[in-house]
């Protein structure tokens, strides 16, 4: 199992949808989770052949320090790796930083966030997913 670490300063080429410049100080305005209905006709006993769920992060990146073009991030077939810390149920969330890694054809996104209404104020969420779409 090889694991590649992709960050803004990494010499490796990140995926085309990744926000290479960073989203520091972007505001997460909405977090939506959606479970797709199971399609028995398309099921081939292989897990990666269909979309099971989607996590959509709607952002206001106008105040971000670097990349202000990102409007929404969709993570397909996601799973929280930090089940005690998720993105749902928080007040105002601010993006501090992130790290994207690739392992066995899946992505892992570790997001560092700030929630001024929670204790502790800073939190880290790790999410594994199979593919992503970024709306700019």
Which positions does each model-derived feature cover?
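Surface-exposed, interaction-prone regions used to assemble/regulate multi-protein complexes
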Residues: 1-136
């Amino acid at each position: 199992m090889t694991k590649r670490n992709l960050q803004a300063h990494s010499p490796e080429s990140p995926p085309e949808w990744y926000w290479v410049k960073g989203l520091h100080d972007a505001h997460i305005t909405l977090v939506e989770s959606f479970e797709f209905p199971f399609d028995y006709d398309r099921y081939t006993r292989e897990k990666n052949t269909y979309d099971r769920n989607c996590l959509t992060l709607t952002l206001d990146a106008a105040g971000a320090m670097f990349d202000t073009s990102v409007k929404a991030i969709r993570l397909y077939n996601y799973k929280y790796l930090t089940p005690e810390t998720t993105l749902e149920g928080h007040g105002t969330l601010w993006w501090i930083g992130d790290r994207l890694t690739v392992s066995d054809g899946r992505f892992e996104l570790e997001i560092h966030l700030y929630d001024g209404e929670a204790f502790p104020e800073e939190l880290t969420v790790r999410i594994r997913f199979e593919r992503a779409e970024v709306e700019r």
